[in-house]
A protein has these predicted regions:
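N-terminal post-signal-peptidase region of extra-cytosolic proteins
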Residues: 47-52, 63-71, 88
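Short acidic-glycine-tyrosine-enriched beta hairpin
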Residues: 55-57, 97-114
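A short, N-terminal "cap"/entry segment at the start of jelly-roll beta-barrel domains
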Residues: 20-61, 144-159
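Glycine- and acidic-residue-biased ligand/ion/polar-headgroup-sensing regions
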Residues: 68-71, 78-97
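Bacterial N-terminal signal peptides
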Residues: 6-15
Length: 159
């Protein structure tokens, strides 16, 4: 009995902290004209992104990403989990060890922590939402899975 009471009292502050934290979160409703697209470090020049929610340098975030025709982010991984949902155009996603999948508007992809994958805009420009559950980063790899500098990975790609 005393154990249950102690446990309940120990968890009580968490309930209030969670509720208080949720109250601090403000809703967001906006059109794309309100966001500013810019180049992100270590990504191909053909990719721009706008922050929809959060701060990609410090924690979870949602980005709206645009890529030009044939634009490709070569084999890479991220330290956080990543979710992608196509808005427009066609994107080709290939997860290491899987067959490539062509995504159209509404298509979805999920890459768990450090899962190597590649993305290419096919047949024209494309746009997609990218959700990261931690600070956004990108680590490129060679054909053997060894990490390589962004400059090396992007040197032979469409910029």
């Amino acid at each position: 009995m005393y154990t249950r009471i102690a446990l309940a009292l120990g968890l009580l502050p968490l309930l209030f902290t969670t509720a208080r934290g949720q109250q601090d979160v403000k809703p967001i409703v906006q059109n794309t004209t309100a966001v500013k697209f810019q180049k992100l470090p270590n990504l191909p020049d053909c990719i721009t992104a706008a922050v929809e929610q959060g701060d990609p340098t410090n924690g979870p975030s949602v980005l709206m990403v645009k890529g030009g025709t044939g634009c490709s982010a070569p084999w890479h991984f991220h330290t956080p989990n990543e979710q992608l949902m196509m808005i427009s155009g066609t994107g080709r996603v290939e997860m290491k060890g899987e067959h490539p999948v062509t995504l159209r508007a509404g298509g979805f992809a999920y890459a768990p922590v450090k899962h190597v994958h590649e993305f290419t805009c096919m047949g024209g420009p494309c746009s997609f939402f990218l959700h990261s559950d931690g600070p956004f980063d990108i680590h490129y790899v060679d054909q053997n899975g060894n990490e390589i500098p962004a400059e090396q990975a992007l040197s032979k790609r469409h910029k």
